[in-house]
Amino acid sequence: MFAIIKTGGRQLKVEKDQTIFVEKIDKNEGETITFTDILFINGKIGTPYVENASVTGIIEKQGKAKKIVVYRHNPKSTHKRKLGHRQLFTKVKITELKG
């Protein structure tokens, strides 16, 4: 059994005991989180969401992804700019699919 959830502007296919990485969620490690924006579960397609359906998980880790380097250069002048960015993420282990 699997479900398709919507979180952080993305749609993810999840199954029980699967680990997923999502955009930063403001909760502490070890806390339980419930996703209620379920697009598909157990053969039911939502319009846009399936009613009385939820996916529960436990937050395993809060962290930052690897750094990406952004380099901007204007070839007609001496202007150049180098920036780094590290995206925040939350690691969630799915424990229950209900619906």
From Swiss-Prot:
<dbReference type="GO" id="GO:1990904">
    <property type="term" value="C:ribonucleoprotein complex"/>
</dbReference>
<dbReference type="Pfam" id="PF00829">
    <property type="entry name" value="Ribosomal_L21p"/>
</dbReference>
<keyword id="KW-0699">rRNA-binding</keyword>
<dbReference type="GO" id="GO:0005737">
    <property type="term" value="C:cytoplasm"/>
</dbReference>
<keyword id="KW-0689">Ribosomal protein</keyword>
<keyword id="KW-0687">Ribonucleoprotein</keyword>
<dbReference type="GO" id="GO:0005840">
    <property type="term" value="C:ribosome"/>
</dbReference>
<comment type="function">
    <text>This protein binds to 23S rRNA in the presence of protein L20.</text>
</comment>
<dbReference type="GO" id="GO:0019843">
    <property type="term" value="F:rRNA binding"/>
</dbReference>
<dbReference type="InterPro" id="IPR028909">
    <property type="entry name" value="bL21-like"/>
</dbReference>
<dbReference type="GO" id="GO:0006412">
    <property type="term" value="P:translation"/>
</dbReference>
<dbReference type="InterPro" id="IPR001787">
    <property type="entry name" value="Ribosomal_bL21"/>
</dbReference>
<protein>
    <recommendedName>
        <fullName>Large ribosomal subunit protein bL21</fullName>
    </recommendedName>
</protein>
<keyword id="KW-0694">RNA-binding</keyword>
<dbReference type="InterPro" id="IPR036164">
    <property type="entry name" value="bL21-like_sf"/>
</dbReference>
<dbReference type="GO" id="GO:0003735">
    <property type="term" value="F:structural constituent of ribosome"/>
</dbReference>
<comment type="subunit">
    <text>Part of the 50S ribosomal subunit. Contacts protein L20.</text>
</comment>
<comment type="similarity">
    <text>Belongs to the bacterial ribosomal protein bL21 family.</text>
</comment>
